[in-house]
Amino acid sequence: MNTVRNNETRYIILELLAIAFLATGGILVKISALSPINTGFYRVLFSLPLLFPIAYKHLKQLSKRDTVILLLAGIFLAGDISLWNLSFHYTSVANANLLTNLTTFTVIPFSYLIFKERIPKFFLAGAAITIAGVFILITGKTDTNGSSLFGDFLALCASLFYAGFLLISYRLRNRISSSVIMFVSGFGSVITLLITASLVEGLQVPHGASQLWPLLGLTLFLQVIGHNLLAHCQGKVTVNLSSVICLSQPAIASIYSFFIFSENLSAIEVLGIIIIMAGVYLVKAQYNLKSIKVCNITEDS
């Protein structure tokens, strides 16, 4: 059976909204009083009871194989969360957002090999324009120094883990709701993060509202709303376009900085944002020319 993903405008808007929620992550991670991996652990842990009422009635549709695949996806997401959170202690929020979202270079070849998605004639041109815009944006925000290189490396590694999660959840989204994907994969994430936090940082317990609210913000904005909404859009938007839209996250984070912290955007930053949006528009225009059929992979029972 084939699933048609024709990239309707409403789902493009919903995915941009998901990215807007995800763009709050860097600010909340830096505010958190807990260590980075512990912060990620509580982000996922607190999300499970919130997702359960939504996912419960759909859990029966899962096979044992589906459950194992989702737990594996959760391990990839845990790797992304851990490395992403750690990167904020070494590099800027803008750089971390940029490098973590460079999943395009991983996702595009694998989507072609696994899902048989054809790459439109001008898709790579649109992606290149978007990436150029992101780099132009970053040049106006980042203070380059030697210590930031390690943080950049962590964020880049996080992008590989996120690409793994994106591909695995995309594969199952043809049959399984996004709430089930986030709920079941959350168990894989929380177990992985618990073990990693205990070994690397020592398990920490938040005390008081001042330590809890950043964790709850991460849970609600990222784990429940952001990733859940993004997973939902993956059922309606091709994975290539989805990966390019994710590159708008640094632009949205820059806008947050302008309104929340009164950080003025330079002319170069504004130019970068405009170029990013132009690249995304070019990619969407190509997909509007022809609906893309994504072949489901036949799985053994």
Q: What is the role of each PLM region?
A:
Residues 10-20, 42, 60-84, 150-158, ...:
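Loop-to-transmembrane-helix transition segments
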Residues 2-4, 43-44, 139-140, 211, ...:
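C-terminal-most transmembrane helix of multi-pass membrane proteins
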Residues 1-41, 75, 83, 145-171, ...:
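Glycine-/small-residue-enriched transmembrane alpha-helix faces in small-molecule transporters
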Residues 9-15, 37-53, 122-129, 150-154, ...:
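Hydrophobic alpha-helical transmembrane segments of multi-pass integral membrane proteins
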Residues 96-102, 169-190, 223-259:
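Helix-helix packing/entry segments at the starts of transmembrane helices
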Residues 51, 71-73, 77, 122-141, ...:
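Hydrophobic transmembrane alpha-helices of multi-pass small-molecule transport proteins
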Residues 53-60, 103-128, 251-271:
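C-terminal transmembrane-helix exit sites in multi-pass transporters
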Residues 18-34, 82-91, 99, 165-176, ...:
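Juxtamembrane C-cap of transmembrane helices in multi-pass membrane transport proteins
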